[in-house]
C-alpha cells in the first residue's frame, strides 16, 4: 500500500508533467523564422550556486535588528529538457538537486516561541538574541516558458520541490522569556553556550513546496549558457497551525549557473 507521503510526492509531479504536455501544442502557434529553429528537443545539464533565505512575510513587529546573515550550502546541479516549438515561445521541464540555507542572528522583543533549557521546555514571549540555522536540500522541478529576446532568453514559470534534508534550529540568548503570556514569569537566558536556550523545529518544516521562478540566459558560446534565476516559494516553510514560529516564512533563492546545450536549437 502506498504511503500518504509517496502520494503527496507523486500527484504534484504528475500534474506538472501533464501541464507540460498540454502546453506543447499551445506555445507553438506563432511560427519562428526557419533560421532560428533547430531540432525539437535539447538537453541542458548544468551546475550553479544558490544563495537562499527564509523570508518572513510580513516582517514581524517583534523584529528589532538583523545582526548577521550568511548563506549555507548552495550547490545545485541537474538538467533541463527543452522543447523547441517552432513558435515564439519554447517550453522546458527540469530536475535539479538543490541545497540552500542561511545562518542568521536577530534581536527580537516579545517574539512568541518555544525553547528548551536543560530539562525544561518553555513557551512564551522572548526578548533577546535569536540565532537560527535553516537549510533545505532536495529535488527542484521547474516548468518554464522560454522567450528569446535579442541574445538573451527570458524564462519564467512554476516549480515544485521535495526536501530530503530539512533543518531549522538555533539558540535564544542574551535576554529573557516571559512564560506563556507577556506578563508571565521571567526566565533569564545567558550568552550563547553559557546559559542560553535552544530550539529545533526541523521536523515541523514542510517536506515539499510550490513556487514561482523568473530568470534569464545569456550564451557564452554556441553551447554554453550563463543563467540567473530567482525563486519565490508560495508554500510557507511551516504550516499555519505551527505556533512556535508565528510569522509565515517563505523560501527565497537566487541561483547563478552554467548550462551546456546538447542537441536542438537555442
Where are the regions that the model predicts?
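Cleavable N-terminal export/targeting peptides
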Residues: 1-39, 264-266
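Short glycine/proline- and aromatic-enriched beta-strand/turn motifs that initiate or cap beta-hairpins
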Residues: 29-82, 153, 205, 261-266
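Extended, folded domain segments that form the structural surfaces/walls around functional sites
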Residues: 36, 41, 49, 66-71, ...
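Residues on the lipid-exposed face of transmembrane beta-strands in outer-membrane beta-barrel proteins
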Residues: 47-49, 75-83, 95-97, 141-147, ...
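Transmembrane beta-strands of outer-membrane beta-barrel pores
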Residues: 49-53, 97-101, 135, 149-151, ...
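Extracellular/periplasm-exposed beta-strand and loop segments of Gram-negative cell-envelope proteins
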Residues: 53-72, 100-137, 163-207, 236-253
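Repeated loop/turn-to-beta-strand initiation elements of outer-membrane beta-barrel proteins
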Residues: 88-91, 151-154, 222-228, 264-266
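Substrate-binding/catalytic groove segments of enzymes
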Residues: 223-227, 234-239
